[in-house]
Each structure stands twice: as structure tokens, then as C-alpha cells.
Amino acid sequence: MEKWRFNSMLSKEELEHQCGLSKSLKCTGSIGNTNGGEDLAINNMIRGWVDSDNSSNIDHLVGVSNIRSLISDDTFLVRDSNGKNYSIYFDIENQIFEIEIEGDRSFLSELESFFSSYLNLNYSYPNDGSKSDNHYYDRSMYDTQYSWNNYITSCIENYLRSEIHIDSYISSSSDNYSKSYISNYVCSGGGLNSTDSESFSIQTSANGSTFDMIGKFKNFDISPKYSHLWVQCENCYGLNYKKFFRLKLHICEQCGYHLKMSSSERIEILIDPGTWDAMDEDMVSVDPIEFHSEEEPYKDRIDSYQKKTGLTEAVQTGIGQLNGISIAIGVMDFQFMGGSMGSVVGEKITRLIEYATNGFLPLIIVCASGGARMQEGSLSLMQMAKISSASYDYQSNKKLFYVSILTSPTTGGVTASFGMLGDIIIAEPNAYIAFAGKRVIEQTLNKTVPDGSQEAEYLFQKGLFDLIVPRNLLKGVLSELFQLHGFFPLNKNFIK
């Protein structure tokens, strides 16, 4: 169960915006209607909440920022402008709605009244059963199970339809709210400084169906408080909802940028379920040169990364099936000491290549590395020669098929050795691929490195790669490449 905390105040425009969502529920009165037929009851309700000093500010709960957040089994901690605290618990699967209130208990009845009027404005009847224009009364008001279920269902439907974008129009007078929505709920410090605010802008599409952040913010960071909910794009600084981010293969919804993935996630999307067999999982570094930095000993640093990632080293190797085709695969993990290549990484990859050579298996190595590991000195540099030697026997002597996949970043000794030795070299979109980094080149040669000159698209034009393949297409492309080179599925059900 997750707990979300909100502390905000919505203006009339924001509440009009959230009421505008009721179009999907066939609301008879639309706030944006220009024919003069706006719903007077809604306007009165807005005016009453904005002007009243004693109101409970229900809009804190049901405003635009929260309407997208009604996910199963969540607790909302709400504070109104009067300092009252409310704990609202939703469990959609088990159909539970509970409210814990500090102080005035009238909040519950006010909440029910609002939800009822919001839910079915086109089905309103007075107590005597005759039709009326009184939108505060609803036939489902006292059927709370019906009200909650329908309201929450509509919220989730809108949420999924927009894929966590903010729907509908935002008026010019609510620009300040638009900015504060991001800063209050997601960003650290509860707001942006003056410099950031000047470069911040919000645009909506012609039909008002998307909410985009334009501009880049160097100091626009997600606070640790909300890091479990959102992932910020490194390219456009847009926010991606974490629950759906893995299903989207860590591709930014705003700009399509490919963010970093862990080795386990890459194995999951490439290898058929139930076919993964890891190799050499117990192989760990023994600190061969007894490297000690001023910050912490090398072995302590290794231990901390092992606890952080759940891995023993910066690469996972093993055997599996890709669409029924048996393969040997190694996947580097940048989260483990920057994917640096030490003696253990070199030994695991060498053993993997030798196993593939003896078993006549196609080979895939997914590269994500900052290069050789400086804490192991020349031993890490020797891994380049050792892996290249094993690769030569695999490719030149045995005539087997090796596919190298370069992800961001692939630099240093990995680029200079097995990363660029594949029979087919595939790069991910926007991947940063280089031998020496931009800063190192500029400081060494005193020359400016052009922007984008070390990205996959530019290098592809220069002939360094064979393909640039997005993640969602990668498994299918690899399967076709293997079949083209004579490797077919063991299971006939995979053969089309």
C-alpha cells in the first residue's frame, strides 16, 4: 500500500477543469460551454468553496492532480487550508473506501454530497421523486457503494486513456497553478526558484488532451519523497509514472528517449520465460592490487554495490532461448560501478564465449560500460585482449555468429574491444558511444567536441553500426537475424 500526501489549494479555474472531466460521464452542463447553459449549481458550488472561510475544501481531494492518482490500494493524506488532516484510503479491488478525520466529522457528508453531484449530474431528483434542476441531489447519493465504484472507475478510465498526461484545457489564468502542480507534488523544495520559473512553460495540444513540460531544468529534480512514484527523463526532464515505466521498457513517454535499464530487466525482455540459466554467479573480485582510495576501500565499495543491485558483478552471463532459439548471452549492468570491466567481468565474458564456441551457440553481448575498472589496474586492461582472443576463435575459426548490442553509455575499453567486434553491431537510439568522453578529449586536445558527435545516430551515418533498433523491436529483429544465419527454434511452435 502506498501513502501519498497532498497540501494544496485549487482556484476556481482548476475546479472548473476537474468538473470538465465529467464530460466522459455524460454531464449535461459543461464549464467550457459558450451558449450560456452552464450548470448554475456547479458555479454556486465553486463560489461557495472559494469564498467560504469555513469550508472543508473538498477540492483538495478531488482536484486535477489527484484525479489521476486513484490507483488500487492507496492512502491519500490530505490537509486543507484550515489545517485539518484527513486520511482517505482507497482499495478498489476489495471495494473499500475509508476516511479518518481529525476534528470535524462533517467532512464525510460534504464529501459524499460532492461526489454524488459530480457523478451523475444528469440524473437528479428531489425527495418527492419528481425531476428537478437541483444537482445536489442524486439518486445514487445514498448508494455509496455504487457512487464510489463508478467514480473511481471513471477516474481510472480517464487515467489510463491519457496515460498519465493531464487532460483537458488549462486557462491562462491558471498558469501559476500549472507550475505549482509540478513543484508541489513532485519536485524538491516545494517549488521552483525564479530562474527555473522563467524557463518553465506548459503547453497543451489543439484538442487539449496532453500536458507537456517544455524546457530543461538543471535543478528540476524529483524529491526523494516522490522518487518511488516518478522517473525523470534525462533528456526532456519529463516525468514518467514508475508503475508503468517498466512495461514501457524505460522509454520516456514525452520524447521517446531510451533511459538506462538494469541487466535483469534486459534479460527479462530478451529471453523467453523459464529458459534463463545463469553462469558463474558466485564469481567475485578479490581486490588483486589491494586498491584503497581516500573515500573507501575497493572491497567495501564492491560490497555496497552488491547490496544495492543484488548482483555479484557488473555483468550477468548465461544460456537461454530467444523465441525458441538457444543462445548464449551476456548483459552488462551500468548500475554496478558504472558497468566497469574488471578481472571478474572479463573472466565471465570469456567463459561465456568459450561455452558458446563449444556448444555452437549464437552469442549476444549487451554492452553498457564506462570502460576498464581503474581499481584493478593493468589486470582490467588485460581483459580486453583476453576477450578479443576468445572472440577471434569463436568468429574466425568456428565461423559462429556474434551480435553486439551497444546501449548508453558504451565507452572506454569495452568500445575498444568486444563492443565493436560483433558480426552485426546494433545500437539503441540516442545511445552515447565513445572511446574517450567529451570532457577528456576537450581537456587533452584543447578542442571543442561538437554536440551529438558521440551519439548513435551520428555514428551510424559514419558507418560504425549496422542497425539502430528500438527496444520494443529488438527481440524480433534478433530472432530474424538468427534465422537468417541458420539458427532456428528448437520448438516447432515458434516457427512461422
Swiss-Prot record:
Catalytic activity: N(6)-carboxybiotinyl-L-lysyl-[protein] + acetyl-CoA = N(6)-biotinyl-L-lysyl-[protein] + malonyl-CoA
Keywords, alphabetical: ATP-binding, Chloroplast, Fatty acid biosynthesis, Fatty acid metabolism, Lipid biosynthesis, Lipid metabolism, Metal-binding, Nucleotide-binding, Plastid, Transferase, Zinc, Zinc-finger
Entry cofactors: Zn(2+)
Gene Ontology molecular-function annotations: acetyl-CoA carboxylase activity; ATP binding; carboxyl- or carbamoyltransferase activity; zinc ion binding
Superkingdom of this protein's organism: Eukaryota
Gene3D superfamilies in the record: 2-enoyl-CoA Hydratase, Chain A, domain 1 (3.90.226.10)
GO BP terms: fatty acid biosynthetic process; malonyl-CoA biosynthetic process
Binding residues for Zn(2+): C233, C236, C252, C255
Family matches, as InterPro entries: AcCoA_carboxyl_beta, Acetyl_CoA_COase_Trfase_b_su, ClpP/crotonase-like_dom_sf, COA_CT_N
Associated pathway: Lipid metabolism; malonyl-CoA biosynthesis; malonyl-CoA from acetyl-CoA: step 1/1
The record's free-text note on cofactor binding: Binds 1 zinc ion per subunit.
Start and end residues, zinc fingers (C4-type): 233-255
Cellular component annotations (GO), alphabetically ordered: acetyl-CoA carboxylase complex; chloroplast stroma
Localization in the cell: Plastid, Chloroplast stroma
Pfam families for the chain: Carboxyl_trans
EC number(s) recorded for this UniProt protein: 2.1.3.15
Keyword Zinc-finger included in the entry's annotation: yes
Domain CoA carboxyltransferase N-terminal: 229-496
Subunit relationships: Acetyl-CoA carboxylase is a heterohexamer composed of biotin carboxyl carrier protein, biotin carboxylase and 2 subunits each of ACCase subunit alpha and ACCase plastid-coded subunit beta (accD).
NCBIfam families the UniProt entry points to: accD (TIGR00515)
PANTHER family, A to Z: ACETYL-COENZYME A CARBOXYLASE CARBOXYL TRANSFERASE SUBUNIT BETA, CHLOROPLASTIC
Function: Component of the acetyl coenzyme A carboxylase (ACC) complex. Biotin carboxylase (BC) catalyzes the carboxylation of biotin on its carrier protein (BCCP) and then the CO(2) group is transferred by the transcarboxylase to acetyl-CoA to form malonyl-CoA.
Protein name: Acetyl-coenzyme A carboxylase carboxyl transferase subunit beta, chloroplastic
